[in-house]
């Protein structure tokens, strides 16, 4: 049920209420019985003959009817207590919000501030702070227990099927276990193969994990600009994106009220929030890259660390010596962050301050456990530029920086392209694994062709499914508005659903143990003509039912054994069902007549012909109408039985 509630004019409206025939459930890990790990249970119809299906859920408390949502107050900050219990942190006053943090916006255009204030935490001394440091010391945190329970989707009871799925897939070197334990999570993080993006100041977070040996995740980008959108719209877009399955959200705001927008989003977000700090730093120096300084950038990092941003995209691999490699490209440097740093390097003829101060950036981010998302500022912006020397030179540098960040105790993932034709995708994954020590890969698509403006969610979804199969851990969505404009609410949903399809297809191909459970449930519902179950098991129940209802709108059609594609006469599944039922009900003498010894093909043919004849007679007897009353169909079925 989609309810956009706005009880007063100062509170952003967000979507609450559960999805059709679903309820929020909570799993309790044996290792930490005080934790409540959210799942969504899809409730199947009474005649389904199978249990309800638990699935991964990113929607937070917004779909839990027992929780009262107050966007002004923000979400519960249960995780803050976990951080404090571990020790090694201090609470402090933090920096004051400065006018330039919000673009020096005037009073007439200033957004309403988030009123609740929480003193920030930061790490002190040499005690472990980051999930990587805990993992390296052999310590299992509550976050690790939480994500292990979340990834399993209640499949402990279905290990036999899980092992069969593993055997059937092609994982390209990934090692997904049949059942995920907290120790497995710890080991993957300790090896640098997975991250839990979880700033110690994001107390509202429901922890999740990014790594190729886990479910493939997706990210949704939101954010205002200098010409469009507002704080209210961006908070609503965040809630809307996670409703449909976004595992993380990046706030790429570039206009007014950047700090305020981010605060509202963070205080109301149960998923990790990422940013590109150079965007805000640029706003603080009037949009002129030449005026950027290390001191200004560092202050911006501290500002965002204190707010609770979980991961930063930092384009530290855009080095002065690589910029000339883009000169002969068709589309040059298309990354906004990459172009900002390239201009700074050329204007000052110096090495990037992101590269020269990388050690200091690591020390700062470690104090708050902000994860690195090492940006691909030289990614190809057209398939003509894919896999060129500029792209791979930067990737090699990102590998070097990954090792530095690990040595400093930081969590790291690597960003990737971009625009890459299908036959050049796998080499990107292979090279990233080699150069970056198997750190998680996070790609924008890639887009597999450049000919479809307005449909780039499809061109990129193809590449995303492929690279996800090859081992990419998180896929950044592309909406239909890519290259054309800022996505609205509907574009966000289309982008998220498209990328959920790509991620799920990748998990199926890898042989992820839990992936096919949902596919099989949909298939059984489809074969049994359980229309409502088929809608509700899908990624987008509302759209599925709307498409069905365009041609068969009545409630009676929800039990009809056909759809508008074939009609009642030509439904292959209905005919198959009738053949099965008919053959099962034959007596021995009837079977002998239809199944002569040594003539298996003839016997099957006889059953089919007889079944077809009965269906033909039944159709004529009921008036040869394309659409039939459900009650009459039921009566006819009783007469045949």
Swiss-Prot record:
GO terms for molecular function: 4 iron, 4 sulfur cluster binding; carbon-carbon lyase activity; zinc ion binding. It catalyses: 5-amino-1-(5-phospho-beta-D-ribosyl)imidazole + S-adenosyl-L-methionine = 4-amino-2-methyl-5-(phosphooxymethyl)pyrimidine + CO + 5'-deoxyadenosine + formate + L-methionine + 3 H(+). Transmembrane segments: none annotated. It is an enzyme of class 4 (lyase). GO terms for biological process: thiamine biosynthetic process; thiamine diphosphate biosynthetic process. Binds 1 [4Fe-4S] cluster per subunit. The cluster is coordinated with 3 cysteines and an exchangeable S-adenosyl-L-methionine. Substrate binds at residues 221, 250, 279, 315, 335-337, 376-379, 415, 442. This is Phosphomethylpyrimidine synthase. [4Fe-4S] cluster binds at residues 563, 566, 571. Keywords: 4Fe-4S, Iron, Iron-sulfur, Lyase, Metal-binding, S-adenosyl-L-methionine, Thiamine biosynthesis, Zinc. Residues 1-21 are annotated as: Disordered. Its cofactor is [4Fe-4S] cluster. Homodimer. Catalyzes the synthesis of the hydroxymethylpyrimidine phosphate (HMP-P) moiety of thiamine from aminoimidazole ribotide (AIR) in a radical S-adenosyl-L-methionine (SAM)-dependent reaction. Residues 1-13 have a biased composition (Polar residues).
